[in-house]
């Protein structure tokens, strides 16, 4: 027993860092946990996506009117697509089709369009499922709003499927 090194005392956790934005309502389980365990919770989003300016988008010579479908991979993509459309004074037509990576992204579209009226298709998180839905609409011209750091699997899947798309 004399040869054993002394054991360090366990330290009590006082602060937790959560890598997402602070919830807008006080009904979040994080606040309940903080109150129950007497913790301090810091909310810091680690990923910050800055939208492209309308002028910068125009310089890329992408014509929104030439696209009949949009591939949306996140809620941020939805927000930035409609912000750019508004900046460019482009009225999104009723015939526009939306291909969303998940059901939650599809429901988020309700913020901008009437869900029943438009043609909205969604997968369940896997992009391959979205590609399978897109194969039924192969004659569409797709727009893929994305960041500079896009997974290579998404353009690879679109190229393999032979889709006409613009990033």
List the predicted regions and their residue ranges:
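Conserved beta-alpha
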Residues: 9-167
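N-terminal amphipathic/basic-hydrophobic helices that include classical n-h-c signal peptides
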Residues: 1-8
